[in-house]
UniProtKB/Swiss-Prot annotation:
Catalyzes the reversible isomerization of glucose-6-phosphate to fructose-6-phosphate. It is found in: Cytoplasm. Its EC number is 5.3.1.9. This is Glucose-6-phosphate isomerase. SUPFAM superfamilies: SIS domain.
């Protein structure tokens, strides 16, 4: 993978000049000039997904110049490097192979001279066997009862992905009830345990090292809760499984290492739902549906690896994002799913994007002179319309938005879905085209308002429009289409990291806070005044001690 400063390329300089031509061009004028604009700026994937990027402040020339940037920064070479098992996470000396976890073609993928696929397939087979036993009721707890509830204990990638997917695929859920605990705040585990029966509860402890502070604190509290009812520590083996690589620590905890599901250093946390970390998904929806999730992601992997940049969906979305972030100065992107089951999708890719590309140092170790990762946020529609869309429509910030919706609802109640989708279509139209002062004045006049009344209110009713959006319309949210959608965003993030010359797959920014917390924790053990920090931190710690 080459280390090329994008801002020093000819393509970047051409984009800067092109931006001067484009900065005042409106989306409405682009549509007025081209009645084929939708056809030119949209694409379908596998007859399951339509991506419409026509309501953006771009022309064919914009995309050509952005694709020149991808060529100059050797995106094609970087894609080959990732798929071939090269150690592109150089700060940790690791390959990046979440694509191997869903490699349904089973073609060899080699790391350090060894094909990883036999081990991947062995873990999948072990997961299937485990899921079949638990779901069928063959797996019994310490009193001989079948499992009814599963608690996934993890944090970050070991929580956000499985929680997001199990929520998104709730229509496929079986009889098992899924619970997710992540926060080290004792309230989270305490509230999760309140309705549960120790005789019928299975815990999944998800920690690669089996040392993650938050996860192991919660796991020990869960074990204490369980043993307060079960008594015999030998019973732990029937109610706890581990998603880890530390067999020694897993065994010492009381878990049978036969019920330890491994993954590898080349699986990054925020890309790990496809691995053993996804065991909670497989338990929730059944292993066959988990395999369909993998198949959907694999189909998008093939599209990403094999499709030319000008038709490559992750690449196109990535380039458009760079255009806004680095040339228009847009600092945030909103992800707005019009599907209640997808309510955790924005939070999942908030982590996926911000932890991956929230870097200020390039791959040469130098501070960058351009923008890297944007701030990602969002809520399901139509809730967001009654919360923050006001600012998107009429505020002073440019906020590119991704609107996501299924054509087919899993809950076709009355006309709910038609009303939901009418809002989906209306919002992107309103954001793009707005409402002029002339239209507002004519509307008021037709309603019989006096000129004075019109003049008093009209300016506040104007919508400038020219707010960019992508619309991603799925046929239906299925395991396959969800897998493809997640992989689409994963590869968008990777593409942006390549072009922006940063390391996408490490996360050193999470380390300093953890180090300082480990230093502060012993200081909280007694009531002595703390003086070892700055005046603010000392005062906060001492007030906490005084009040607790």
């Amino acid at each position: 993978m080459k280390n090329i400063n994008p801002s020093q390329t000819a393509a970047w300089k051409a984009l800067q000049q092109h931006f001067e031509q484009m900065k005042d061009v409106t989306i409405s004028s682009l549509f007025a000039k081209d009645d084929q604009r939708f056809n030119r700026f949209s694409a379908t994937f596998d007859d399951q997904m339509l991506v419409d990027f026509s309501k953006n402040r771009i022309t064919s020339e914009t995309l050509e110049k952005l694709q020149d940037l991808a060529k100059e920064t050797d995106l094609a070479g970087a894609i080959k490097s990732m798929f071939s098992g090269e150690k592109i996470n150089r700060t940790e000396d690791r390959a990046v192979l979440h694509i191997a976890l869903r490699n349904r073609s089973n073609t060899p993928i080699v790391v350090d001279g060894k094909d990883v696929m036999p081990e991947v397939n062995a873990v999948l087979a072990k997961m299937k066997q485990f899921c079949d036993r638990v779901i069928s009721g063959d797996w019994k707890g310490y009193t001989g009862k079948a499992i009814t509830d599963v608690v996934n204990i993890g944090i970050g990638g070991s929580d956000l992905g499985p929680y997001m997917v199990t929520e998104a695929l709730r229509p496929y859920k079986n009889h098992l009830n899924m619970h997710f605990v992540s926060n080290v705040d004792g309230t989270h585990i305490a509230e999760a345990l309140k309705p549960l029966n120790p005789e019928t509860t299975l815990f999944l402890v998800a920690s690669k090292t089996f040392t993650t502070q938050e996860t192991m604190t919660n796991a020990h509290s869960a074990r204490d809760w369980f043993l307060s009812a079960a008594g015999d520590p030998a019973h732990v083996a029937k109610h706890f499984a581990a998603l880890s690589t530390n067999a020694k620590a897993v065994g010492e905890f009381g878990i049978d290492t036969n019920n330890m599901f491994e993954f590898w250093d080349w699986v990054g946390g925020r890309y790990s739902l496809w691995s053993a970390i996804g065991l909670s998904i497989a338990l929730s929806v059944g292993f066959e549906h988990f395999e369909q999730l993998l198949s959907g992601a694999h189909a998008m992997d093939k599209h990403f690896a094999e499709t030319p940049a000008e038709k490559n969906l992750p690449v196109l979305l990535a380039l458009i994002g760079i255009w806004y972030n680095n040339f228009f100065g847009a600092e945030t992107e909103a992800i707005l799913p019009y599907d209640q089951y997808m309510h955790r999708f924005p939070a999942y890719f908030q982590q996926g994007n911000m932890e991956s590309n929230g870097k200020y140092v390039d791959r040469n170790g130098h501070p960058v002179d351009y923008q890297t990762g944007p701030i990602i946020w969002g809520e399901p529609g139509t809730n967001g319309q009654h919360a923050f869309y006001q600012l998107i429509h009429q505020g002073t910030k440019l906020i590119p938005c991704d609107f996501i919706a299924p054509a087919i609802s899993h809950n076709p109640l009355s006309d709910h879905h038609a009303k939901l989708l009418s809002n989906f279509f209306a919002q992107t139209e309103a954001l793009a085209f707005g409402k002029s002062l002339e239209d507002v004045e004519a509307e008021f006049a037709a309603a019989g308002k006096t000129p004075e009344q019109v003049a008093h209110v009209a300016p506040f009713k104007v919508f400038e429009g020219n707010r960019p959006t992508n619309s991603i319309l799925l046929r239906e949210i299925t395991p396959f289409s969800l897998g493809a959608l997640i992989a689409l965003y994963e590869h968008k993030i990777f593409t942006q990291g390549v072009i922006l010359n940063i390391y996408t797959f490490d996360q050193w920014g999470v380390e300093l806070g953890k180090q300082l917390a480990n230093r502060i924790l012993p200081e909280l053990a007694d009531d002595q005044e703390v003086t070892s920090h700055d005046s603010s931190t000392n005062a906060l710690i001492n007030r906490f001690k005084n009040w607790r």
